[in-house]
């Protein structure tokens, strides 16, 4: 039986492992960027990586930045693990260059096809644009201006209108409806005046702006001017001469693009549009750019992957590193990489031992401020603001409350890829996986013993330092960990029988210590010959004649040797033998 979605499921699991850095056995380094991946996956899709891993076992592969850009490689990596490839006029060249260098032939083919579709960008002559004057033959009756990327952002706010050209009326554009606010229409401009609509650069940064001019076999003199200014603004101005006395239309679209980009995705095309209804979500440019800017400023950037909303675009860019697996901040002491700079700063403190956040009550230091807040709430009676709705227990952090709530709901979202066991906490899954791998990253500096869990190392180190921070408030006994303290309270202070002293519980005594500390050893000098040992021996009927009565130290009588043994013994007999030395 073959499962149709088995391959997709495998790729999905591998991609999740890559994003989490789990079982990744290689790191691709491009400048300051690092990408975790699996060798066998890369070698399966790239002849370049296949050749490298046949000849070397190095974990790190350094790629030439002039040949492979980080953004292009990121898209290529996503294609390898997901099978999806999003190409546009901005990234197609970088992806094609990276795929060609790494010998990913399938992507090279796709990029070539896509670049042919974008050929009008590299060859403006195909659009028949005259720099000064010219005649453009328009075949249909529609003039449509589409701003594609802005479509998805202002879908609910911007009206969708179709700008139609009617030579008899003498107007190329006319609004079909009026909004509540007063706006100036395109057809209200005077002859020779240019109205420039400026959009925020981040809106049009990846936008694809296409201007479709069609008329019913209309030959109209038109002035087209394409000028690239020094500040990297590409301004496309269309001035239609006043051939009809009723209306004059002047349209200007300003598209800002970043420095270093080859050509913006903006072109003047001629199309024979047989079915105008098939064109959806076409937007009419408003002459009031200020109002559009105000509406756009209210929109907050949102992650397309998880839906999280951010106050600033820079926060979104940092957040996207989590989904892409990009970790540009590397520790120079141990080589560990992080997605954010503050994570690296906190990590470096584990090497330096710096703890800048001090508790005012006990002078204990912490590497992070959140650790200090948690400590104060746990040990110094500060308010625990997070309360469980089911059992009313209060917690110091929201994450602790979330984990606790899973006890009531039974939710266990973290699954082991090896055995299928589920866990409520991610850290518990991490410790569980180490049982499979045998990894023990926490090593004692004193004796060299290694542990899979950091708390085990902390408890172990107290044996070297003699620290016993857990004290019983009833009797004053102290312990190295909370587990032994709870055990002590259960056995000693719950009405059960008394157990040994806490020192014996913490450090079990050996045989020699038990003899030396026995009450008998303080009063009597016990010799081995004075100790009788009860032995249980199974005796058969034929063995009964071997039993000899022993009275004091007198030898048995001669006739006793001939006396028959008693019959009917059904239970094992206890014979006390005196040890002879």
From Swiss-Prot:
InterPro entries: BTB/POZ_dom, SKP1/BTB/POZ_sf, Znf_C2H2_sf, Znf_C2H2_type, ZnFinger_BTB_dom_contain. GO terms for cellular component: nucleoplasm. Keywords: DNA-binding, Metal-binding, Nucleus, Phosphoprotein, Repeat, Transcription, Transcription regulation, Zinc, Zinc-finger. Residues 167-193 are annotated as: Disordered. Belongs to the krueppel C2H2-type zinc-finger protein family. Residues 24-89 form the BTB domain. This is Myoneurin. It comes from Bos taurus (Bovine). One of its GO terms (molecular function) is DNA-binding transcription repressor activity, RNA polymerase II-specific.
